[in-house]
Amino acid sequence: MAINTDTSGKQKALTMVLNQIERSFGKGAIMRLGDATRMRVETISTGALTLDLALGGGLPKGRVIEIYGPESSGKTTVALHAIAEVQKEGGIAAFVDAEHALDPTYASALGVDIQNLLVSQPDTGESALEIVDQLVRSAAVDIVVIDSVAALVPRAEIEGDMGDAHVGLQARLMSQALRKITGNIGKSGCTVIFINQLRQKIGVTYGSPETTTGGNALKFYASVRLDIRRIQTLKKGTDEFGNRVKVKVAKNKVAPPFRIAEFDIIFGKGVSTLGCLVDLAEETGILIRKGAWYSYNGDNISQGRDNAIKYLEEKPEFSEQIKQQVREKLDKGAVVSANSVAKNNEDDEDEDVEEEE
């Protein structure tokens, strides 16, 4: 009896304090986790099936994302693909172009609706981050991309002389901005992607000398950090037509981290979605590869990976069928490495020549 009375008293006290908190800070200020309307984190596709798989479904909505890597590794391409996917679902996207380097033609080729894409090219880092904060607080924008953190120059640095030292200004700016923005991001459900560059630390003997710009705040606030690297140049003969890139999920708060994905980025076209599909279909056993030949249900469909991609491109219904089967296999728990290295260079080219002869 004493236990029941004690429990009843605690429950009354809990109800009173919860009501008091809601009166003081508004409804929803505190809740039981089981009552939350969004238990499962919704995701945005990156345009690359292998990367979506490595991320546990895609980029999480309502979170801070950091994409970093060397120059020309595909950072902006991945971000633009995410924008295109959001727009396909009827969402509103914004691009804060601090580098003043956005190519509308390339963005359009990737599927971005440039007519409805909100673009800002601010002069200072403070202006850029204030614009981001206002967009996020509006709850009207679904995704904001900042390109890049390195280009968010503090106002004091712009107004000062060229040789002036401004130690830690950008790091303090990022730390303050993220403290303000993060809470609003969670409430609005807006995804904020920061593109970042790499720098070399001086005097490092052990470990990697590489570091990202803007201090450590972004590393802590980001739910997902993607390290993207170019590992191979794709060629047809002597002509270069794209890059093979490897993405390591350096941090992931919503799925297992440290997974690796590889995919092709074609110059002028973006991520090769069909290339990703061929890789995953092969790994899940839907497409069988013997030597250079790809077969489906015992029938040869193409010789070489490039021709397999071309075959799927020419037959969209078959491509959709393969995609559906791949998703079904993955939903059933099929284990894939998500990082098949494309063998689409010399071997395929030689075999294509033999076939023509």
Swiss-Prot record:
It comes from the Bacteria. Coiled coil: none annotated. Residues 346-357 have a biased composition (Acidic residues). GO terms for biological process: DNA recombination; DNA repair; SOS response. Pfam families: RecA, RecA_C. It is found in: Cytoplasm. Keywords: ATP-binding, Cytoplasm, DNA damage, DNA recombination, DNA repair, DNA-binding, Nucleotide-binding, SOS response. One of its GO terms (cellular component) is cytosol. Its main location: cytoplasm. Residues 337-357 are annotated as: Disordered. InterPro entries: AAA+_ATPase (IPR003593), DNA_recomb/repair_RecA (IPR013765), DNA_recomb/repair_RecA_CS (IPR020584), P-loop_NTPase (IPR027417), RecA-like_C (IPR049261), RecA-like_N (IPR049428), RecA_ATP-bd (IPR020588), RecA_C_sf (IPR023400). NCBIfam families: tigrfam_recA (TIGR02012). Can catalyze the hydrolysis of ATP in the presence of single-stranded DNA, the ATP-dependent uptake of single-stranded DNA by duplex DNA, and the ATP-dependent hybridization of homologous single-stranded DNAs. It interacts with LexA causing its activation and leading to its autocatalytic cleavage. This is Protein RecA. The gene is recA.
